[in-house]
Amino acid sequence: MKLLVADIGGTNARFAYQEKNNSDLNNFAYLKCSDYENIYDAIDHYQQKNNLDIENMSIAVASTTKKNDIKFTNNHWNFKQSDFLKYFNLNKLIFVNDFVAQCLSLASFYKDISENRTINDKLLNDYDLKTIKSGTPIKNAPLLVTGPGTGSVSYTHLRAHETNQ
């Protein structure tokens, strides 16, 4: 696998690494975007500091990913998606909008929520979860991801049977 996962926002770049399929993420790092001239320098720093062999990347960005050019509203790291494969000599690369990434992550535990199972504490813990109103979850109810930021809110309606996770 040798996968770098990243969340690139306007202020911070968050990184983690997965050595093998189904292994835990490790080598967590939080870097200030303003400390680096570009995203390549930040990733190079992270990779060298942790002595990592990176073959694949999955990068969530606070920007649209529909075009080759990635442009941030409040971050000077503008770049082209196509340059990453060449620069880092990657096997696979995925860019996704950060809110879309959050929506897609819901599939990892949607079935557990709808069937009243306990959520894996590696995914979420008591600090991450806040009960707004107690009750019994409604099976197949829509889920919503919201948050601050300069982008638009994304929505996805996932059903447990629609995912293979």
Question: What spans do the regions from the language model cover?
Answer:
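Short glycine-aspartate micro-motif
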Residues: 3-7, 56-58, 143-147
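Short beta-strand scaffold segments in enzyme catalytic cores
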Residues: 13-17, 152-158
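A short, N-terminal amphipathic alpha-helix
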Residues: 41-50
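Short beta-strand-loop/turn "lid" adjacent to the catalytic site in phosphate-handling enzymes
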Residues: 50-95, 100-115, 145
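A gly/proline- and charged-residue-enriched helix-loop-helix capping module
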Residues: 109-141
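Small-residue (GG/TT-enriched) beta-loop-alpha framework at ligand/catalytic clefts
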Residues: 138-147, 158-159
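Single conserved hydrophobic/aromatic residue that forms the stacking wall/gate
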Residues: 157-160, 164-165
